[in-house]
Structure formats: structure tokens, C-alpha cells
């Protein structure tokens, strides 16, 4: 929304000093809406006191209020709206007692919220985005051309501040109104489902699809123009980077970028939230149908049992043979019966089960080198161990031997910076490069 130049304490003191207050019961709000509607039909935007009284009479009849005091109550309502700064009253000495009334910006804002902004229009949004795109392009071109301070204020800052920012605020307001409409649709769906869900299914589907379509139209229109708008904002931002005195333009561009990002991201998030609600409603309807179907069956069965002696009936049931489950999980439970007894050459023991045991044995055997202070040639030791195991386990055994060996000590030759020789450790081409461990 538009930024405020005053602080919170200043705004509070200002509102208290001017005694601002708004009180609009439903009949007064209806009167204000009637005034705005009639005012929109006039070219001059002005209304006389007699026309206001006529509008109040229509509202009074709609609320079934007495007509005897219509003049007094209309006068009180008009004075109250003037006091609340919803109407401006203009009088002249030549036409005493014949005042002219005009809606104030506050009155227009309230009536716009309830009348003009309630309907979403893709065409209106497209026109707004088209105007914004044109303004941003002209501002970006002016920013790249450069100029004095007056040039930046008139051709860059002013269009961004008083045209682009206001349209962004209008689009943001449209999204917030869509949020309210979504909540109203949710309330309508809840009321329909509470009354008669069978008759409400078609109405719920219509409300859900219409709202989903409106949200998607809004988001598609925004995303189609979003990249172009961001590109022009970046052009302006790049043009201000070399000017230290244009911080006010740079700050405004940053605010506009944030607004545009917020508008587009909230549009997508709103769609995602509505999709979740749509699924929830459909799940509720399916559950209601299942529950109602079971309830009808139980009711019919209970009624048949109660009237059995008057209307006998027979119950026929079928019991099919059970299907055997041949999945792999079931076969694993009786593995011996299926595969039989394996020969010794095919028996397999998972390596992880003996890893700790093997590591302990190797650690104990290698500890002899440390105890006797005998140099440990890693290539020879690994080759000796690998000769005791099948080829499939060579890699794992070699890793265990090397891990245990390096824990015992280091090779002084490592500090010379010279590489060690490669030594074969099995008959299949595996080699290791390591100096002799001689310092424990």
C-alpha cells in the first residue's frame, strides 16, 4: 500500500485533534450507497438536498421505517454524514437553504469498496497492466537518457509515484477483495452442505469452478506482464546506480519491485490454498456419500428384520475360495522350502555382519609390529591378507587393513615429499602406494 510520511504518534495526534470517527449502521451505509449510485448518474457529480431526501426515502421504505418523520430523519442522516466527512456541503448567500452536496474522497472510497470494486474484470486488469507497462517504459527510457534533477523528478519519479504505484495499489486491493470473496464462497458452500448436500453438490461445484477460474485468470494476467514490468524497473535501477543524488528514485523503484513480487507471489499462493480447499470439499462430499450409502443400507436392513413376519425374505450369501498370496514377502517366510539347502560353495554371509570381528582380528595381528617396533610394509601385509580371502572381498579387506595400519603410526618417508612406489597386492591388478610405517 502507499507509504506514510508521518509517524504513528503524529497520525494518532492528528486523528485525535480532528476528532475523526466513522459510524455507519446498515441503514446509513445503504443511504450512502444510494447517494453514490444516484451521484454516478449525474454529469456534474452534485446533488441537492431534495435529491438526498428522496434517496433517504427509498432506503427508509426498504427498511420498512415510518414515513411520518422522514424529513427529520433524513436531515439528521445528512448532517451526520457531513460531520463524518462523507459528504461536503456547499451553501451560498444567493440561494439560502438550497445547499449543494458532493461526496468526499472518504465517501467515494467506502462506496467504491462496496460497489465498483466487488466485480473482478480481466479486461480491467489487462488495461491497468497495459498502462503500467507504458508508463514504466517511458520512465525507463527517460532514466537511460539522463538529465538534471528536474528531468528525473518530472519524467521518472512522478510517473512511478503517481501512476505506477497507484495502479499497483489498485491491483493489490483487487487481490484483497478476492480474498474476501473466497471467504464468502466458503461460507456459502458450508451453508449449502449443512442444508442438503445432495442438492448442494452442483451448486458447490459451480462456486468452486468459478472461483478457481477467476483466480487463474488473475494470476495468468499478472504473470504474463510481470517479467516485462520487472525488466523496466531494473533498467531504471541500473540508470540510478551511477547517481548518488537519486536515492529517492532508487528507493521508490525498490518499493515497486517489492509490491510487484508480493502481488505475483500472493496470487500463486492464493491459488494453491484454494486448490487445497477444493480438495477438502470434494473429500467431504465423497465421505458424505459413502456414509449416507451405508446409512441407507443399514436402515433398509433394520426395516426388513422388523417386518420379517409380515414379509418373509431369504438371505443368500457366497463364500469364494481364498486366493493364495504369492508375493515375494510371503515366499521369504518359507525360503528353505522353496530354495532347498544350498551347497557350501554358494553360501553367502553378508560382509557387514563380520566387519567388526574381522577388524578386531586384523588390529590384534598388526599390533605385533608396534610392540616389536618392526617396520610395517603395507604392500606386503595387504597382499598377505588378501591371499586368504576370495576376490569379491578384496576391496573391503584391504580397506580394513589400511585403516588399522595407519592408526598404529606414520612413515617418516612421507615428510620427504617423495612419492612411494606402487606395489601389487593381488593377482588381479590391484596396487597400493604407501611408504613403510616405521614410527609408531
UniProtKB/Swiss-Prot annotation:
Single GO BP term: chromosome segregation
Keyword Ribonucleoprotein recorded: no
Subcellular location: Cytoplasm, Nucleoid
Superkingdom of origin organism: Bacteria
Chain intervals for the UniProt region annotation (Leucine-zipper): 208-236
Primary localisation category: cytoplasm
GO molecular function ontology, one term from the record: calcium ion binding
Function (record text): Involved in chromosome condensation, segregation and cell cycle progression. May participate in facilitating chromosome segregation by condensation DNA from both sides of a centrally located replisome during cell division. Not required for mini-F plasmid partitioning. Probably acts via its interaction with MukB and MukE. Overexpression results in anucleate cells. It has a calcium binding activity.
Similarity comment text for this entry: Belongs to the MukF family.
Name of the protein this chain belongs to: Chromosome partition protein MukF
Protein species of origin: Escherichia coli (strain K12)
Organism lineage: Bacteria, Pseudomonadati, Pseudomonadota, Gammaproteobacteria, Enterobacterales
Protein's gene: mukF
Amino acid at each position: 500500500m502507499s507509504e506514510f510520511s508521518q509517524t504513528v504518534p503524529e497520525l494518532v495526534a492528528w486523528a485525535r485533534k480532528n476528532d475523526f470517527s466513522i459510524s455507519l449502521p446498515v441503514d446509513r451505509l445503504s443511504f450512502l450507497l444510494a447517494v453514490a449510485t444516484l451521484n454516478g448518474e449525474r454529469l456534474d457529480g452534485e446533488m441537492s438536498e431534495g435529491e438526498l431526501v428522496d434517496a433517504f426515502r427509498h432506503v427508509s421504505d426498504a427498511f420498512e421505517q415510518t414515513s411520518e418523520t422522514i424529513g427529520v430523519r433524513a436531515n439528521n442522516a445528512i448532517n451526520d454524514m457531513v460531520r463524518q466527512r462523507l459528504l461536503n456541503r456547499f451553501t451560498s448567500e444567493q440561494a439560502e437553504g438550497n445547499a449543494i452536496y458532493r461526496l468526499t474522497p472518504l465517501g467515494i472510497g467506502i462506496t467504491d469498496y462496496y460497489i465498483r470494486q466487488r466485480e473482478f474484470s480481466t479486461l480491467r486488469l489487462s488495461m491497468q497492466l497495459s498502462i503500467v507497462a507504458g508508463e514504466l517504459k517511458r520512465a525507463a527510457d527517460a532514466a537511460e537518457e539522463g538529465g538534471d534533477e528536474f528531468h528525473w523528478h518530472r519524467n521518472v519519479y512522478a510517473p512511478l509515484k503517481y501512476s505506477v504505484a497507484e495502479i499497483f495499489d489498485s491491483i493489490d486491493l483487487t487481490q484483497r477483495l478476492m480474498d474476501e470473496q473466497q471467504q464468502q464462497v466458503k461460507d456459502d458452500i458450508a451453508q449449502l452442505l449443512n442444508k442438503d448436500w445432495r442438492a448442494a453438490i452442483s451448486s458447490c461445484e459451480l462456486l468452486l469452478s468459478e472461483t478457481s477460474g477467476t483466480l487463474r485468470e488473475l494470476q495468468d494476467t499478472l504473470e504474463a506482464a510481470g517479467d516485462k514490468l520487472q525488466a523496466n524497473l531494473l533498467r531504471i535501477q541500473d540508470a540510478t546506480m551511477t547517481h548518488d543524488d537519486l536515492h529517492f528514485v532508487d528507493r521508490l523503484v525498490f518499493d515497486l519491485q517489492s509490491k510487484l513480487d508480493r502481488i505475483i507471489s500472493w496470487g500463486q499462493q492464493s491459488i494453491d490454498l484454494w486448490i487445497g480447499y477444493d480438495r477438502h470439499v470434494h473429500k467431504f462430499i465423497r465421505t458424505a456419500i459413502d456414509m449416507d450409502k451405508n446409512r441407507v443400507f443399514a436402515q433398509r436392513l433394520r426395516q426388513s428384520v422388523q417386518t420379517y413376519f409380515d414379509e418373509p425374505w431369504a438371505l443368500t450369501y457366497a463364500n469364494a475360495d481364498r486366493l493364495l498370496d504369492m508375493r515375494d514377502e510371503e515366499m521369504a517366510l518359507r525360503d528353505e522350502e522353496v530354495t532347498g539347502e544350498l551347497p557350501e560353495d554358494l553360501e553367502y554371509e553378508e560382509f557387514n555382519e563380520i566387519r567388526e570381528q574381522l577388524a578386531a582380528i586384523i588390529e590384534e595381528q598388526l599390533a605385533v609390529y608396534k610392540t616389536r617396533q618392526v617396520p610395517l610394509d603395507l604392500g606386503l601385509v595387504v597382499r598377505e591378507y588378501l591371499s586368504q580371502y576370495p576376490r569379491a572381498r578384496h576391496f573391503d579387506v584391504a580397506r580394513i587393513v589400511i585403516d588399522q595400519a595407519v592408526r598404529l603410526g606414520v612413515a617418516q618417508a612421507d615428510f620427504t615429499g617423495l612419492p612411494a612406489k606402487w606395489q601389487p597386492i593381488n593377482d588381479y591388478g590391484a596396487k597400493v602406494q604407501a611408504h613403510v610405517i616405521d614410527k609408531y
